[in-house]
């Protein structure tokens, strides 16, 4: 049975696919058999990324497949050391399903309150309403420059999340 990481968010454009792809590439470079399940069939960002990498001969090759549902992705998950679920934008019922089956759930966010507030709301809903273990939910600061003050403020805000 492979390890499963879900990358989900309440809103689009916060770096879900970028984070899913960089994580997958890092593990693949270390010799893991990795697959990204691109669950946003309307945009297919991770799948398009794979096509560009293949055309350019970039390695390591990361397996990416578009799936219409999580259950379709789960059918092949055990064939891989690591399956990364690249969730669709906006939290839905599928977001809860991804959270339930993932060993680690990553919620990417920017540094602004406009990004962090909905992310915290989602984390709280997953833990309090849907019973997702809070210890497997983590935040990833994306597109976060190098301002020590901004990073410290963001970490403080996110650390106050139950």
Predicted regions and their residues:
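Conserved catalytic-core segment of NTP-binding enzymes
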Residues: 82-162
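Short, solvent-exposed charged binding patches
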Residues: 1
